[in-house]
């Protein structure tokens, strides 16, 4: 295992622990809404010039009946997703949709079309931490086209 990968995994686990702890202390609310990611951490990677490590928290709403499919999006760099709460479904074009439970992870290669991200439940949402490696100055997501 490379040094960079060990650091990424350690950061992901730390961010997941912080997010899970904060969630456990929060008062109960209605079902979460899917929204933009909440950025938790960003830093330059000295051993990968021109790249940044970004950690975000994702809140994934329950799948509503009749909800249209998302057109999807892409990421300019690698994305490692760790589910901290609930069960989510993640899909990348050309691969079967994966059901990912609390404590499990999902990987997206740079430029892959990410076309499914939803809770596996119609009544309960899910939460996840995404660790992203992005080129300096690049957005976190790109349109599907």
Predicted features by range, described:
Residues 65-70, 89, 96, 106-119:
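Histidine-centered metal-chelating micro-motifs
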Residues 33-71:
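A short glycine-rich, His/Asp/Glu-containing loop-to-beta-strand
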Residues 76-94, 102-104:
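Glycine- and acidic-residue-biased ligand/ion/polar-headgroup-sensing regions
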Residues 97, 111-139:
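Ligand-binding loop in jelly-roll beta-barrel domains
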Residues 1-9:
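Bacterial N-terminal signal peptides that target proteins for export
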Residues 49-50, 60-61, 94-111:
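Short acidic-glycine-tyrosine-enriched beta hairpin
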Residues 21-34:
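Cleaved targeting-peptide boundary
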Residues 8-18:
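Bacterial N-terminal signal peptides
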């Amino acid at each position: 295992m490379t040094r960079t990968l060990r650091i990424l995994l350690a950061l992901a686990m730390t961010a997941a622990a912080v997010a899970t702890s904060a969630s456990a202390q929060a008062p109960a609310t209605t079902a979460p809404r899917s929204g933009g990611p909440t950025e938790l951490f960003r830093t330059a990677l000295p051993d990968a010039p021109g790249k940044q490590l970004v950690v975000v928290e994702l809140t994934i709403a329950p799948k509503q009946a009749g909800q249209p499919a998302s057109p999807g999006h892409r990421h300019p760099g690698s994305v490692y997703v760790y589910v901290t709460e609930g069960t989510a479904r993640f899909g990348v074009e050309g691969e079967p949709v994966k059901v990912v439970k609390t404590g499990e992870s999902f990987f997206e290669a740079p430029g892959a079309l990410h076309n499914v991200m939803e809770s596996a439940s119609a009544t309960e949402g899910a939460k996840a931490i995404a660790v992203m490696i992005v080129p300096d100055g690049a957005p976190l997501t790109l349109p599907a086209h």
